[in-house]
Design a protein with these regions (language model features):
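Beta-propeller domain segments
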Residues: 2-12, 98-188
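Acidic, Gly/Ser/Thr-rich repeat motifs that build Ca2+-stabilized beta-propeller blades
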Residues: 1-104, 144-147, 151-159
Length: 188
């Protein structure tokens, strides 16, 4: 992985290749702070008989690094992390960032409904400036993301037990998690 450190079994989430550029989303872990989140990297590809990937450039990192103590109930580390990548247009990608089970059940907070953080969102990332903005929110764990053009964007989402979803995605729309779901808690 070059200069990307994988310290957990939830490492790489997705890759997206655009001509000679490869994008990779991955969970990250900061040892000195003992916290984790999601990051997006890019690199150029050189194809000389063997695929070689140069050093990675970080273009996004979730702004709030999460400590495990945020959870009030036992859960799988880094569950519901998202990480799907799709190209929106020439200069923008969409990236799903899961709620990391900070959903009002496993933790007191409900990140998906809080517009002051990156979690539980689909983000639009400007590849020229590395700036990002919320495209849609109220997501739990988007695991499939497709964009035919700016008007036809679809996402599949892992819901809680019995609550998986297929949604057409619209800019600035709230998809309801965890306030609205057909699923139930795994331990209810």
């Amino acid at each position: 992985y070059g200069n990307i450190r994988m310290n957990n079994f939830f490492g790489v989430k997705d890759i997206f290749i655009d001509n000679d550029i490869i994008y990779l989303s991955s969970s990250y872990y900061e040892i000195e702070k003992d916290c984790h989140g999601l990051a997006l990297y890019k690199s150029s590809i050189e194809n000389n008989e063997k695929l070689y990937i140069n050093e990675w450039d970080e273009i996004f990192k979730s702004e709030k690094c999460l400590k495990e103590e945020i959870h009030t109930k036992k859960r799988m580390p880094l569950a519901s992390s998202g990480g799907r990548i799709v190209k929106l247009d020439e200069n923008n990608l969409l990236l799903s960032v899961g709620d990391y089970a900070v959903d009002g059940y496993y933790a007191k907070e409900k990140f998906s409904q809080d517009l002051s953080n990156d979690y539980g969102k689909i983000l639009q990332i400007d590849l020229l400036t590395k700036q990002h903005e919320i495209f849609s929110y109220g997501h739990r764990n988007v695991q499939g993301l497709y964009a035919e053009n700016k008007k036809n964007i679809f996402a599949t989402e892992h819901g809680p037990h019995g609550g998986d979803e297929l949604n057409k995605i619209y800019r600035e729309k709230n998809y309801g998690w965890p306030l609205a779901t057909f699923g139930t808690g795994y331990f209810d």
